[in-house]
A protein has these predicted regions:
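Short, acidic Ser/Thr/Gly-rich low-complexity loop/linker segments typical of extracellular
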Residues: 49-64
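Outer-membrane beta-barrel signature, preferentially recognizing the C-terminal barrel domain
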Residues: 453-456, 496-499, 527-581, 598-611, ...
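Short acidic/polar hinge/loop motifs at secondary-structure boundaries
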Residues: 68, 147-149, 173-199, 242
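Face-selective signature of the C-terminal outer-membrane beta-barrel domain
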Residues: 297-322, 345-490, 513-518, 571-575, ...
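Surface-exposed extracellular loop regions of Gram-negative outer-membrane beta-barrel proteins
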Residues: 482-489, 512-561, 576-595, 715-726
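N-terminal periplasmic accessory domains that precede
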Residues: 93-99, 109, 141-144, 178-179, ...
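Outer membrane beta-barrel strand-and-loop segments of large Gram-negative receptors
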Residues: 409-413, 460, 555, 572-630, ...
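Short, acidic, small-residue-rich periplasmic hinge/interaction motif at the N-terminus
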Residues: 44-46, 79-83, 95-134, 153-155, ...
Length: 771
C-alpha cells in the first residue's frame, strides 16, 4: 500500500468517526482546602447508570484537567492521596474550581500495581511519561532523551529522526547549552514531549521540538542540590554544579553555579579528489588535535506566583575559553603523480562570553490566558589562530588570523488563548531584533580582511484553533513572518545582499481513535534560513590550496511535511513524506585567479523528496525488565552533478536501537543499550555503518536524597564518524575518531528538593540558535 493510499484511508476513518457520537469536554480545576492547585489528582468520568469508566485524566501542575465523553448522564469522581473523594453529578462543561477536603484517616501500607502505555499521541507529537517509570532512574535528562521514541542520541547531540536537531525546552524555557541536559536529574522529570509537527505558535524555522516538564516539588524554605561527575575519556574530566532555591509564600529566589573542565583529542584522516582544469588532484590528509574546554557559568533569578498570575526574571552568564593545538599532514598528487607534502601546525584560542536577561509573565483574566516573554542577549566570540605551514615546494610561512564576532539580540512575544466553541483559539505576535558584527583579518597578504555588519528585524503573527467534533480533534494554524535584513561591508550598505523575506507557514492536524488505535494526520510547512556565518562573504583561509566563504545570495529552504502517526498499547508508529525546495549545501569551485586552489561555498540545490517510517515498541516483562525496540528507515530521491555526471544519492538509511532497563534487588537499576546505523545516503553524504553499546548502574539512597550513577559509554570503542561527501568538483572520504569509550561516576545530593517555578518560555529562540 502506498503512503498516499494509507493517508487517504486514515482520513476516511477519521471522517466516519465524527458521525459516531456527540462528545462533550468536561474541564475544571482541583484545589486543596487552602486554595492551592493539586497536581496528580485522579479525575474519572463515569456513567450514572452503571458507573462504567468513560474517560480519565490526571491534573497538571495548575490543578487543571479535561476529560471527554458522550452527552449522557455522567458524574465526575475526583480523588487524591490524603484527601476525601469528591463526586459531581451531571457536571457542566466547565466545573470551575473543585475543592477537596483533607481525609480524616490515612491508609496503612498499600501496594498498587498497574501498567499504562508510556507513550501517547499528544498535540503534534508523542508524550512519554518519565516520573513513576523506569526512565526516572536513568540518570540525566540527556540520557532520558536517548531512550525516547524517534529520538537519536550521539554523544551530547540530540536528533529527532527525519527532522534534524530539535529546539529543546525545560518547563517552557529554551535550552541554549546542551550541558543543561546533563545538569537535570532524571528523577526531576515528569514527562517528555517530542513534537514532530510544530504548529503555528512555533517559528517557521523550527522543524521539531522537545519539551521537558519537571516534577513540581512541594515545600518552602531553602533547598539545594549538588551534582559531581568525574570521568575518564583518555583524559580525566570534572563537572561540578550547584543549584539553590529559596521559597516562601509563592516567592522564589533561585540560582545556579556550574564549572566544567573537559579535554579531548580528536583525530581525522581524509582523502579528497578534486576534478580541476589542471587535472585530478588527490590529497591524503591526517591530523591530531588536543583541545581543552573549561566552562564557567552562573544564573540568578526570582519568581512570584500569586493566584492565577506568575511573573519572574533571571540573569544568566557564561564564559567559555577553549584552546587547541594540532598538526596535519597532507600528501598532494596531480593525475596520480606525487606533487608535494604540506604540513601545518596550529594553535587556536577561542573566547565565548554570553549574558542573557530573560523575563516573563503568565496569567488569566477571566477565560483569557496570557503569556508574555522578553529576552536580551549579548555575545562576544573571538578566535585567534597562529599557523606554521611547511611544504616541499614552497617557502615556509608563519601567519596569524583573527575573527571577532559580536551579537546582540532583543526579542519579545505575546500569546493569548481563550476557549472558543468546542476548543481553544490561540493567537500572538513575536518580534526580534539582531545586530551582528563580524571582523576577519590576518597578517599576511594572501588573507583578505572583511568587516561585516548585519542588522535584522523579524516580525511574526500567528493564529491557531483547536476544536473537537465527536471523537475527532482538529487543529488549524497559520503563521506570517516578515524579515528585514541590512548587510553592510566595510561600512557600505550592500543592496544586493540586504534581504526582505515574507513567509506564510500553515499547519493542519486531525486526530481520532479508531478502535483501540489512536491515529493522527498532520501537515506543516517549515523554512530554514542560514546562520549569519553562512551569509558572510568573507573569504577565510583553510590551507594553501583551500579557502572558505559564505554566500549572501542564498535563498531560504522551504519544506512541506506530511505525516501519519498511530499508537496502540506499547507501540508507536510514524510515517512521513517531505518535499524540500532550495536546500543548501557546500560546493567546491575553483578559486578565482588560481589554477590549483579551491573555494568552498554554499549554494542552493533543486527540489527533492524524502520518505521516512519509524516504529517504537516499549513493553514490560516480569515487572522488572523494560526493553525498548526502535527501528527507522529514511530514503530520498536526491541527485547532484558530480565530475560532469549526474549522481543519484538514494540509498535508504536504517537506524536501530535496543535499550534495556532491568530492576535488580536492593533498588539497583542496570541499563544495557545498543544502537546501530546502516550505510546509506543523507543529503549529499554517504554514511558508513556503525554500532555502539552503553552500560550503566544506578542506585538512590535515603528516599532519593542521594544517588550514584556509574556509566560506561561505547564499551567496545566501535563508534566512528565515517562518511563520503560529494559535490560538483570533489569527493571527500573522511573519518573522524574520538575517544568515545567514556567511564564516569556521578553523585547527586538533594536537600529539601524544590525546583524553581519559573514558567517563562523565552523569546527569539530560533534567532538565538542562529547566533
Amino acid at each position: 500500500m502506498s503512503l498516499k493510499e494509507l493517508m487517504a484511508g486514515l482520513l476516511l476513518c477519521l471522517t466516519f468517526n465524527t458521525l459516531l457520537a456527540e462528545v462533550r469536554i468536561y474541564e475544571g480545576k482541583v484545589m486543596d482546602n487552602s486554595g492551592k492547585p493539586l497536581e496528580f489528582a485522579n479525575v474519572a468520568l463515569q456513567s450514572l447508570e452503571d458507573s462504567t469508566l468513560i474517560d480519565g485524566s490526571v491534573t497538571d501542575a495548575e490543578g487543571k484537567f479535561a476529560v471527554r465523553g458522550s452527552v449522557v448522564p455522567v458524574f465526575l469522581r475526583i480523588s487524591a492521596m490524603g484527601f476525601e473523594d469528591r463526586i459531581i453529578d451531571n457536571p457542566t462543561s466547565d466545573s470551575g474550581d473543585i475543592m477537596l477536603s483533607p481525609a480524616s484517616y490515612m491508609l496503612g501500607e498499600v501496594i498498587v500495581k498497574g501498567s499504562r502505555p508510556m507513550a501517547k499521541l499528544k498535540g503534534g507529537g508523542v508524550q512519554v511519561a518519565v516520573s513513576g517509570t523506569y526512565l526516572a532512574n536513568t540518570g540525566t535528562a540527556l540520557e532520558v532523551l536517548g531512550k525516547i521514541p524517534f529520538v537519536a542520541k550521539s554523544g551530547s547531540s540530540i536528533e529527532v529522526l527525519g527532522k534534524g536537531t530539535p529546539i529543546i525546552y525545560i518547563n517552557g524555557r529554551q535550552v541554549r547549552d546542551m550541558s543543561e541536559l546533563d545538569q537535570l536529574a532524571s528523577t526531576d522529570i515528569k514527562s517528555v514531549d517530542v513534537i514532530t509537527n510544530p504548529g503555528a505558535r512555533y517559528a517557521s524555522t523550527v522543524n521539531s521540538v522537545i519539551k521537558i516538564s519537571t516534577v513540581a516539588h512541594a515545600g518552602e524554605g531553602l533547598s539545594f542540590n549538588d551534582r559531581t561527575t568525574v570521568g575518564y575519556k583518555h583524559y580525566a574530566y570534572l563537572f561540578e554544579q550547584v543549584n539553590f532555591n529559596w521559597r516562601r509564600n509563592g516567592f522564589d529566589i533561585f540560582g545556579m553555579l556550574n564549572y566544567e573542565n573537559y579535554r579531548e583529542r580528536p583525530r581525522f584522516s581524509n582523502t579528497t579528489f578534486q576534478y580541476l582544469k589542471s587535472g585530478i588532484v588527490q590529497q591524503n590528509s591526517s591530523g591530531l588535535e588536543a583541545a581543552k574546554y573549561p566552562v564557567y557559568q552562573g544564573k540568578i533569578g526570582l519568581n512570584y506566583n500569586v493566584s492565577s498570575h506568575n511573573l519572574g526574571f533571571y540573569y544568566d552568564f557564561s564564559f567559555k575559553s577553549s584552546s587547541s593545538i594540532g598538526r596535519s599532514l597532507t600528501n598532494r598528487y596531480i593525475d596520480r603523480v606525487f606533487s608535494e607534502t604540506l604540513e601545518n601546525f596550529y594553535d587556536i584560542n577561542r573566547h565565548n562570553r554570553q549574558q542573557l536577561f530573560s523575563a516573563y509573565y503568565t496569567g488569566e483574566v477571566g477565560k483569557l490566558r496570557l503569556s508574555a516573554n522578553f529576552d536580551a542577549l549579548w555575545q562576544i566570540n573571538d578566535r585567534h589562530t597562529t599557523e606554521n605551514e611547511i611544504t616541499t615546494m614552497n617557502p615556509e610561512r608563519d601567519f596569524t588570523t583573527c575573527n571577532d564576532v559580536k551579537n546582540r539580540l532583543f526579542a519579545g512575544n505575546l500569546i493569548a488563548s481563550l476557549p472558543v466553541w468546542k476548543g481553544d483559539f490561540r493567537f500572538g505576535t513575536e518580534i526580534s531584533n539582531i545586530h551582528r558584527t563580524d571582523v576577519y583579518s590576518g597578517n599576511a597578504e594572501f588573507i583578505r580582511r572583511n568587516d561585516i555588519k548585519i542588522s535584522e528585524t523579524t516580525t511574526a503573527l500567528f493564529a491557531e484553533a483547536e476544536q473537537t467534533f465527536g471523537l475527532v480533534s482538529a487543529s488549524v494554524g497559520l503563521r506570517w513572518e516578515h524579515t528585514d535584513s541590512k548587510y553592510r561591508q566595510s561600512g557600505q550598505l550592500s543592496e544586493d545582499q540586504s534581504r526582505r523575506y515574507h513567509n506564510l507557514a500553515p499547519s493542519v492536524m486531525l486526530s481520532s481513535p479508531i478502535g483501540n488505535v489512536n491515529a493522527r494526520l498532520a501537515y506543516v510547512r517549515k523554512t530554514s534560513r542560514l546562520a549569519f556565518e553562512q551569509l558572510s562573504s568573507a573569504v577565510k583561509y583553510i590551507d594553501r590550496y583551500s579557502y572558505e566563504s559564505g554566500n549572501p545570495d542564498l535563498k531560504p529552504i522551504y519544506r512541506d511535511y506530511f505525516s501519519a502517526s498511530a499508537t496502540w498499547k506499547d507501540l508507536v508508529i510514524e510515517m512521513e513524506y517531505s518535499s524540500t525546495k532550495n536546500y543548501f549545501m557546500w560546493q567546491t569551485s575553483e578559486y578565482p585567479g588560481s589554477d590549483d586552489a579551491t573555494l568552498l561555498t554554499m549554494v542552493n540545490m533543486p527540489r527533492f523528496n524524502s520518505f521516512g517510517a519509524y516504529i517504537n515498541w516499549s513493553p514490560t516483562f516480569f515487572d522488572c525488565w523494560h526493553p525498548v525496540l526502535m527501528a527507522g528507515v529514511q530514503a530520498q530521491d536526491f541527485e547532484i552533478s558530480h565530475a560532469d555526471k549526474i549522481m543519484k544519492l538514494n540509498l535508504p538509511l536504517g537506524t536501530f536501537r535496543f535499550d534495556n532497563a532491568i530492576n535488580l534487588p536492593w533498588g539497583v537499576w542496570v541499563n544495557i543499550d545498543f544502537s546501530a546505523r546502516t550505510s546509506g545516503n543523507c543529503d549529499n553524504l554517504y554514511l558508513k555503518p556503525y554500532w555502539q553499546c552503553n552500560m550503566g548502574l544506578y542506585k538512590s539512597f535515603d528516599k532519593d536524597s542521594w544517588s550514584v550513577k556509574l556509566q560506561l559509554n561505547d564499551v567496545f570503542g566501535t563508534w566512528r564518524q565515517d562518511m563520503v561527501s560529494y559535490d560538483a568538483l570533489s569527493s571527500i572520504f573522511s573519518k573522524k575518531i574520538y575517544d568515545t569509550r567514556d567511564l564516569s561516576i556521578t553523585v547527586r545530593y538533594n536537600f529539601n528538593s524544590a525546583r524553581s517555578r519559573y514558567k517563562g518560555r523565552g523569546a527569539g529562540n530560533t534567532d538565538k540558535s542562529r547566533l
